[in-house]
Amino acid sequence: MPKICTFLGISIYMYFDEHNPPHFHALYNDFRGKFLLPSLNYTAGNLPPRIIGLVIEWAELHKEELLDNWNRIKETGKYKKINPLV
């Protein structure tokens, strides 16, 4: 599972064997969350509201890169790191 970014203690992952629709996972301490692409809807998890907001803020800035990584991982298993929020 590639870690594509880390910022403010939040790690962003995309898994190689995941199903559609496109999405990514955020981990923060013992909390986890799943966000859909391109809508950025938070669909599952137990992340604190403040962390959800930070993840969405970051993802809005990098939506195209996230979608590109989703396609790359599915097609080739390769991905690119994405810059952090700060």
Features from the language model and the residues they span:
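Basic nucleic-acid-binding interfaces
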Residues: M1-V86
